[in-house]
Amino acid sequence: MRHKRSTRRKRASATQLYQTCKATGTCPPDVIPKVEGSTIADQILKYGSLGVFFGGLGIGTGSGSGGRTGYVPIGTDPPTAAIPLQPIRPPVTVDTVGPLDSSIVSLIEETSFIEAGAPAPSIPTPSGFDVTTSADTTPAIINVSSVGESSIQTISTHLNPTFTEPSVLHPPAPAEASGHFIFSSPTVSTQSYENIPMDTFVVSTDSSNVTSSTPIPGSRPVARLGLYSRNTQQVKVVDPAFLTSPHKLITYDNPAFESFDPEDTLQFQHSDISPAPDPDFLDIIALHRPAITSRRHTVRFSRVGQKATLKTRSGKQIGARIHYYQDLSPIVPLDHTVPNEQYELQPLHDTSTSSYSINDGLYDVYADDVDNVHTPMQHSYSTFATTRTSNVSIPLNTGFDTPVMSGPDIPSPLFPTSSPFVPISPFFPFDTIVVDGADFVLHPSYFILRRRRKRFPYFFTDVRVAA
């Protein structure tokens, strides 16, 4: 039989033990100092507080919350909320009511009548007019001041040649002052101006090697784009849509939204469902403005893209920096070009056997009128005689009747033939040409097919067994 384990009883607290053992003197040594507050820590606080005051800090054996107001920095006061003061109003007079006064307020005494409508007009009484006449015999005297000598006012104009070009100076317009016109001199003298020589600034370039009229740039360094750094991946784009509409390579075009501007930086937001049309532009969230540069004698169209491969919990996106480029056209340096390149022309006929002459003098050639009636011509043939091939007749006419145009008479050269000419019509090739071939030779061992063993499925243990 299994014995039941006795449960552990909880010990009485120090306060409960102190109430029972104090009178009998059987208290443990740690009960009386803890209840009476005579422990070592209490004695340190008791005697140490005589020399140091920590009352404002709230240090004690309590919960450590800093007291009622909490912990505050030394030398500062806790924030207090200002209580708004209400404006003082005059007291309200309360009418006293006696015990014998009536509590019913009479409405007839306090009722006032309001007159509606406009007031009645007052009718004036008929009366005459009072006319008063008076006559004054004193003559009118006008005070006229004597006219003295007229004063002449002068206006002077000063021209500063430092701020005005002398070649465009014009005499000022006449000014009017007090009825007198004052004219300036009609001409401008050039002797009063100073001729300042122009200085040439120091230019850090060789004027003999200048090939264009492009202004000389300053000494300000050109900012590097950083397209070919180690941290930038290089991707070549072949699709021509990269030049005009690069957004079609990243996301699908939606005509319901506003179109993208290819000259600005493009921002994209991808979803996890639809991939990019071009796999090279996968996870691209930003495609910066285009830049046209020259790289190894080519005009290169470049754009820098930013990928968002990873995304942290805080929302920060991490991805690679890719340089997309497409070469437009090559640039040939000046050293590789030939300014006056001449080509040697080979004669079409042998000039040693031909004997003809052309008049070295000047002759006039008059064009005849175009004949409306075209004379049909027979097909002309040219013969080429060689030792390796047979004579072949090739028609040179296009099939249409060509009008005969008159001109200077130039005899055609005559060529001797090594073999008699036999015209053949129609023309067919004499030899049979068979075009057949392959780029590999199959080994003879592959022509023999191997015999395969037949397999019969016996489903004893769900495994096929070879017979």
From Swiss-Prot:
GO cellular component, as recorded: host cell; host cell endosome; host cell Golgi apparatus; host cell nucleus; viral capsid
Gene Ontology terms describing biological process: microtubule-dependent intracellular transport of viral material towards nucleus; symbiont entry into host cell; viral penetration into host nucleus
Major subcellular site: virion
UniProt KW DNA-binding keyword: yes
GO molecular function, one term: DNA binding
Modification(s) after translation: Highly phosphorylated.
Sequence motif Nuclear localization signal, residues: 1-12, 448-456
Cystine bridges: 21-27
Keywords: Capsid protein, Cytoplasmic inwards viral transport, Disulfide bond, DNA-binding, Host endosome, Host Golgi apparatus, Host nucleus, Host-virus interaction, Late protein, Microtubular inwards viral transport, Phosphoprotein, Viral penetration into host nucleus, Virion, Virus entry into host cell
InterPro entries: Late_L2
Source domain of life: Viruses
Coiled-coil parts of chain: none
Subcellular location(s) of the protein: Virion; Host nucleus; Host early endosome; Host Golgi apparatus
Subunit structure as annotated in this protein's UniProt entry: Interacts with major capsid protein L1. Interacts with E2; this interaction inhibits E2 transcriptional activity but not the DNA replication function E2. Interacts with host GADD45GIP1. Interacts with host HSPA8; this interaction is required for L2 nuclear translocation. Interacts with host importins KPNB2 and KPNB3. Forms a complex with importin alpha2-beta1 heterodimers via interaction with the importin alpha2 adapter. Interacts with host DYNLT1; this interaction is essential for virus intracellular transport during entry.
Family membership: Belongs to the papillomaviridae L2 protein family.
Stated role: Minor protein of the capsid that localizes along the inner surface of the virion, within the central cavities beneath the L1 pentamers. Plays a role in capsid stabilization through interaction with the major capsid protein L1. Once the virion enters the host cell, L2 escorts the genomic DNA into the nucleus by promoting escape from the endosomal compartments and traffic through the host Golgi network.
Protein known as: Minor capsid protein L2
Species assigned in the record: Human papillomavirus 33
